UniProtKB/Swiss-Prot annotation:
Its main location: secreted. This is Putative potassium channel blocker TXKS1. The keyword Secreted applies. Keywords: Amidation, Disulfide bond, Ion channel impairing toxin, Neurotoxin, Potassium channel impairing toxin, Secreted, Signal, Toxin. Expressed by the venom gland. Inhibits potassium channels. InterPro entries: Toxin_alpha-KTx_8/9 (IPR008911). It comes from Olivierus martensii (Manchurian scorpion). It is found in: Secreted. It holds the Pfam family Toxin_6. One of its GO terms (cellular component) is extracellular region. It comes from the Eukaryota. Disulfide bonds join C32-C49, C35-C55, C39-C57.
Length: 60
């Protein structure tokens, strides 16, 4: 029972991830987090962030 539940959960997670990757929401989310860190280190805010890595910062 426990093994079956684990397999079902894994299939659901894989399905959700594949849906997100096809819409590239996950990639964009990761890129935006990296952008926030990079811009934050420069004392700026994120202006544009898109996947694949396209990041532009703006002042203040």
């Amino acid at each position: 029972m426990n093994r079956l539940t684990t397999i079902i959960l894994m299939l659901i997670v894989i399905n959700v991830i594949m849906d997100d990757i096809s819409e590239s929401k996950v990639a964009a989310g990761i890129v935006c987090k990296v952008c926030k860190i990079i811009c934050g280190m420069q004392g700026k805010k994120v202006n544009i962030c898109k996947a694949p890595i396209k990041c532009k910062c703006k002042k203040g």
